[in-house]
């Protein structure tokens, strides 16, 4: 197969040669190789300004990120063979890390499969196709997954906003077999059922696995507040780890049904209470009622989805963490997390310092965490690092 060329401007290859995989539209020599000559999902040979090939790129010509490097070898295009090879490499890491088949199997760019995310729930796979190139080759993606893993069922969970930029429709559909509404998983020895069809993202957030494991020594015999609880990833584990009482707060009645379901599954239903409503309003009401907690977990959805949201997003993180601190006992633990890629950890740390000072409390950083190793960070692609988790101790100033 002979592929067309996509030529870069002079010196535009530096970031790519340093290891990054993304090509921006303003880096392309459109006089030599017009982007409008390509269709979304096409592949091309990426060339330096002097014509030297850099590899194979998959194209999204109408996007700012107009291409993603698939291979640095021009003989290796995105096809079933390459997918099988890369999925096997991804699988070998996860099987080394985990003794049970519950993990993120493929994490996009970090696993050298840009636009592809696969979460594994035993013999059920939930797949997100976030690029035109992957959508165009979804039959090959499915065939590769069936060959490598032989699952009982595969779900296309393609309802992410990331597809909008690619001009792709959102949909959720069975790709293979029959996917149940809820699937079983185990994390840190705690059992869960996740709503893969109707739930958020793939139905579960494996990225905080290691951070949730760190809860154990802090929650035994303690009263715990889990904010933005979803189906209880943090809260149910806190209860299973020995918390005396857990309150889960979420705006979604459906999510809180999941909390109750998972509490019952682990025999901790009598220790878990659910509060449905806006988290900020719930925080105000809890403060007005003079409620106090030994541990507060604040793991909100991304307040900063784009760079232009930075100012408002930082204000939201500040408001959330300060209100959470107001509910802590004198020697309390705050787990403050962020999944906003655009919020650096140092900025989250500064927010916590400022909030603690505003409340005249001392703050100690006990542990810092990131995403688990099934979400490996590609060190040349800082955008692949997004999870921050800071476990802090709040003390009176005196």
Q: Where are the regions a protein language model picked out?
A:
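Non-catalytic accessory regions of SAM-dependent methyltransferases
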Residues: 1-120
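Non-catalytic substrate-recognition/targeting regions of SAM-dependent transferases
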Residues: 106-119, 135-205
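Conserved class I S-adenosyl-L-methionine
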Residues: 221-230
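Conserved SAM-binding loop of SAM-dependent methyltransferases across substrates and taxa
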Residues: 231-244
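Conserved SAM-binding motif I beta-strand of class I
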Residues: 245-250
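S-adenosyl-L-methionine
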Residues: 254-297
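Mobile active-site "lid"/loop adjacent to the S-adenosyl-L-methionine
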Residues: 293-323
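C-terminal catalytic and target-recognition region of SAM-dependent MTase-like enzymes
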Residues: 319, 333-398
């Amino acid at each position: 197969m002979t592929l067309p060329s996509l030529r870069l401007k002079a010196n535009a290859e530096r970031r790519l040669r340093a290891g990054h995989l993304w090509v921006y539209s303003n880096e392309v020599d459109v006089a030599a190789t017009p982007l409008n000559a390509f269709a979304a999902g096409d592949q091309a040979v990426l060339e330096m300004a002097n014509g030297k090939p850099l590899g194979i790129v998959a194209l999204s010509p109408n996007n700012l990120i107009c291409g993603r490097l698939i291979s640095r070898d021009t003989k290796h295009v995105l096809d079933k063979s390459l997918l099988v090879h890369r999925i096997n490499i991804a699988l070998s890491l996860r099987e080394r890390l985990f003794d049970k088949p519950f993990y993120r199997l493929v994490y996009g760019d970090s696993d050298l499969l840009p636009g592809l995310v696969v979460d594994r729930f035993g013999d059920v796979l939930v797949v997100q196709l976030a690029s035109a190139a992957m959508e165009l080759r979804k039959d090959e993606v499915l065939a590769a997954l069936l060959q490598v893993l032989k699952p009982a069922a595969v779900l296309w969970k393609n309802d992410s906003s990331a597809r909008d930029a690619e001009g792709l429709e959102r949909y959720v559909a069975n790709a293979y077999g029959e996917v149940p509404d809820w699937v079983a998983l185990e994390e840190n020895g705690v059992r869960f059922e996740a709503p893969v069809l109707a739930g958020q993202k793939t139905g579960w957030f494996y990225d905080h696995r290691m951070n949730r494991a760190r809860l154990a020594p802090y929650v035994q015999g303690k009263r715990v507040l889990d904010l933005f609880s979803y189906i209880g990833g943090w809260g149910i584990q806190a209860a299973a780890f020995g918390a005396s009482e857990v309150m889960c707060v979420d705006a979604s009645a459906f999510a809180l049904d999941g909390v109750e379901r998972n509490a019952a599954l682990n025999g901790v239903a009598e220790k878990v209470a659910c509060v449905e409503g806006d988290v900020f309003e719930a925080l105000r009401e809890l403060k007005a009622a003079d409620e106090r907690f030994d541990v507060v977990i604040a793991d909100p959805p991304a307040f900063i989805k784009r760079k232009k949201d930075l100012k408002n997003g930082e204000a939201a993180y500040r408001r959330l963490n300060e209100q959470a601190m107001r509910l802590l006992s004198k020697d309390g633990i705050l787990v403050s997390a962020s999944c906003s890629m655009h919020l650096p950890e140092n900025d989250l740390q500064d927010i916590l310092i400022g909030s603690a000072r505003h409340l005249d409390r001392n703050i100690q950083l006990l542990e810092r965490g990131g995403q688990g190793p099934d979400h490996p960070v590609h060190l040349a692609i800082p955008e692949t690092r997004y999870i921050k988790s800071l476990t802090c101790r709040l003390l009176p100033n005196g």
